[in-house]
């Protein structure tokens, strides 16, 4: 394997100034997500979701909806992820849009989506 210690990217596209931030962080998040979609990034709605049940677990999931202050992703309640969230609902996540030199981090308590919303989503998925 080649030496990776020297790998480093200089980020120069745009600085983020605290004084320029909107009062509602969802305004900026939705703007950035829209720009990632318009830039045709691969899976711009993908984010790393971390759960913790005494030790951390992280995996990539897909954002499926935004209704501030809620971000929606779906999982099988019986999956490892679903079981971890049921036991300990605090989660953290990070969207990374490298080509745009942006990331968005968040943390909060995960809870099940309303049944109707969940049923509608799962009914829309293709059968395999």
List where the protein language model places each region:
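Binding-site signature for planar aromatic cofactors or substrates
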Residues: 1-128
């Amino acid at each position: 394997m080649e030496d990776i210690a020297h790998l480093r990217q200089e980020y120069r596209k745009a600085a983020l100034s605290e004084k320029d931030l909107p009062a509602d962080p969802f305004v900026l998040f939705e703007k950035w997500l829209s720009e990632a979609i318009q830039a045709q990034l691969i899976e711009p709605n993908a984010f790393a979701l971390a759960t913790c049940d005494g030790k951390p677990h992280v995996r990539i999931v897909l954002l499926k909806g935004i209704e501030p202050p809620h971000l929606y992703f779906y999982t099988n309640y019986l999956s490892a992820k679903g079981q971890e969230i049921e036991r300990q609902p605090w989660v953290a996540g990070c969207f990374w849009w490298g080509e745009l030199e942006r990331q968005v981090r968040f943390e909060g308590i995960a809870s099940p989506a309303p049944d109707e919303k969940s049923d509608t989503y799962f009914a829309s998925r293709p059968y395999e």
